Amino acid sequence: MLYRSISCPKGTFFMTTPPAAAEIFGDNLEKAIAYHESLATDGSVRGFIGPREVPRLWDRHILNCGVIGEAMDEGISVADIGSGAGLPGIPLAIARPDLNITLIEPLLKRSVYLNEVKEALNLDNVTVVRGRAEEKVVRKQVGLVDIVTSRAVAPLGKLATWSLPLVKIGGRMVAMKGSSVEEEIERDAKEIRKAGGTDIKVYTVGEALLSEPTTLISIRREK
């Protein structure tokens, strides 16, 4: 069993690396642990992670992001928009080193942190781009990818207008969503179609590993 001592304002405590982490991250488990430590300490101090989230980083943030690789074919290109502190892009890159992942983040302090994590963990399959997904300069720099991911970025309709232009025709946006996803689909259906989206699917991943599986919505770019 692996333990790490994490310093926080209320003292020091030990966190156990959950057994599921070894299943999800395999040979890259130590990188996942190092990322967890970075979020719990540096990430919290710099305001990327709220103090209340630190004790539940594994379950609510790292593991549920790592399992989204179940929805992706081998060796594809992925763009993670509004990457923030690297969720879901960094756990995905650790779990799936075969993927080529671009992290798109507009804020300087967060993009600096993402580059620090990339270098510290030797994530050769990660590229960091500072900017917004809807900006022409970013779209030109990133090009077209197979899948665009996101987590807690925007309402579904707006998310589709930002994500789908980065996706190859026939590719997909795959967004992490909560229990209200069906309501979002109904509310934003016209906006999704206008953005060129079709073939909407909702499914879960990580059922065999997580107590609360991750819910994903997948939308294919038709035009």
From Swiss-Prot:
Location(s) in or outside the cell: Cytoplasm
Q: Which SUPFAM superfamilies match?
A: S-adenosyl-L-methionine-dependent methyltransferases
An example of a Pfam family matching this protein is: GidB
What InterPro entries does this protein's entry cite? rRNA_ssu_MeTfrase_G, SAM-dependent_MTases_sf
Q: What is its EC number?
A: 2.1.1.-
What enzyme class is recorded for this protein?
Answer: transferase
Cite the entry's keywords alphabetically: Cytoplasm, Methyltransferase, rRNA processing, S-adenosyl-L-methionine, Transferase
**Which Gene Ontology terms cover its molecular function?**
rRNA (guanine-N7-)-methyltransferase activity
- Sites binding S-adenosyl-L-methionine sit at G82, L87, A133, E134, R151
Superkingdom, according to UniProt?
Answer: Bacteria
Q: Which family does it belong to?
A: Belongs to the methyltransferase superfamily. RNA methyltransferase RsmG family.
Write down the HAMAP family for this protein, in alphabetical order.
Answer: 16SrRNA_methyltr_G
Function in brief: Specifically methylates the N7 position of guanine in position 518 of 16S rRNA.
- In Swiss-Prot or TrEMBL terms, this protein is called Ribosomal RNA small subunit methyltransferase G
Q: Which organism is it from?
A: Corynebacterium glutamicum (strain ATCC 13032 / DSM 20300 / JCM 1318 / BCRC 11384 / CCUG 27702 / LMG 3730 / NBRC 12168 / NCIMB 10025 / NRRL B-2784 / 534)
Q: What is the lineage of its organism?
A: Bacteria, Bacillati, Actinomycetota, Actinomycetes, Mycobacteriales
